[in-house]
């Protein structure tokens, strides 16, 4: 019965997410009414997607791999993942002069950085609950994220008419909404124990995930 209920829940989740996504695409074409604004938004989205695997060092793969291993301490896996993202984001901050060279990025740099950080943190939490086999929560989060993204688009693009800035802000807040929901609903907060940082495990996780970065980047090229 658990398998049937989980399968049904994932089917509903996938259908709902795809249905909402079906409305989002034409809505964006309408809301981002200027070709220039749409082009800038698309370029910034691609830049975000390229920066995410670099900033996170592909640690999402390691969280699943080492989180599923019952011999590993769950808190250590979570803290190691958070430390990796923190380190990567610090490097990104130091590289701000280089990132600002991306076409059209300088004007939107704070929002671009917010998007990258929000996405990395959301992935940290969602991959961690996947490693704990909280499949129902994963399915619920998928619908919540898509729905919140649509609502944020309506607010920032139709009501406030913020253009490319609103586009980035909507994506960042949708990821943050998902992250906060999963962090508390999935009990991730119970694993926030900095003293459980495991340097040996961290090296193993990096050896596993670093080779994944080129593949993640090539997906968006």
Feature locations, PLM:
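Signature of the first transmembrane helix
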Residues: 2-60, 115, 150, 210-221
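Membrane-water interface segments that mark the loop-to-transmembrane alpha-helix transition
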Residues: 5-17, 43-100
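Residue-level recognition of transmembrane alpha-helices
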Residues: 10, 14, 42-45, 81, ...
């Amino acid at each position: 019965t658990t398998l049937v209920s989980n399968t049904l829940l994932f089917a509903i989740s996938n259908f709902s997410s795809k249905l909402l996504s079906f409305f989002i695409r034409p809505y964006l074409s309408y809301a981002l009414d200027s070709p220039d604004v749409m082009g800038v938004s698309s370029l910034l989205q691609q830049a975000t997607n390229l920066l995410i695997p670099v900033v996170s060092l592909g640690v999402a793969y390691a969280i699943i791999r080492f989180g599923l291993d019952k011999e590993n301490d769950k808190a250590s896996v979570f803290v190691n993942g958070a430390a990796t993202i923190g380190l990567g984001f610090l490097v990104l901050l130091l590289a701000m002069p280089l990132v600002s060279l991306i076409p059209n990025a300088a004007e939107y740099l704070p929002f671009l950085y917010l998007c990258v950080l929000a996405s990395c943190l959301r992935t940290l939490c969602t991959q961690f609950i996947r490693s704990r086999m909280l499949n129902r929560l994963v399915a619920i989060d998928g619908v919540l994220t898509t729905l919140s993204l649509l609502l944020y688009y309506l607010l920032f693009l139709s009501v406030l008419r913020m253009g490319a800035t609103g586009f980035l802000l909507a994506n960042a807040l949708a990821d943050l909404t998902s992250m906060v929901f999963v962090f508390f609903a999935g009990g991730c907060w119970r694993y926030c124990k900095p003293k459980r940082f495991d340097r040996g495990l961290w090296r193993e996780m990096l050896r596993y995930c670093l080779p994944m970065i080129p593949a993640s980047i090539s997906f968006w090229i």
